[in-house]
């Protein structure tokens, strides 16, 4: 969820993560990804 995403240093981004980032989970169901920079 959004809280665990933030604790892991990620941000919630709709649809898909931009290129320099990778997905580490989801935020609000499947459409919103939790993304983190390398």
Swiss-Prot record:
Cystine residue pairs: 5-34, 12-27, 17-35
Gene3D superfamilies to which the protein is assigned, alphabetical: Antimicrobial Peptide, Beta-defensin 2, Chain A
Entry keywords, A to Z: Antibiotic, Antimicrobial, Defensin, Disulfide bond, Secreted
Molecular-function annotations in GO: CCR6 chemokine receptor binding; chemoattractant activity
InterPro entries listed in its UniProt record: Beta/alpha-defensin_C, Defensin_beta-like
Principal subcellular localization: secreted
Keyword Translocase: no
Keyword Cell cycle: no
Subcellular location(s) per record: Secreted
Record-linked SMART domains: DEFSN (SM00048)
Superkingdom of origin organism: Eukaryota
GO BP of this protein: cell chemotaxis; defense response to bacterium
Pfam families for this protein: Defensin_beta
UniProt GO cellular component terms: extracellular space; specific granule
Entries under SUPFAM superfamilies matching the protein: Defensin-like
Tissue-by-tissue expression: Neutrophilic granules.
Recorded family membership: Belongs to the beta-defensin family.
Known role: Has bactericidal activity. Active against E.coli ML35 and S.aureus 502A.
Protein name (record): Beta-defensin 12
Organism of this sequence: Bos taurus
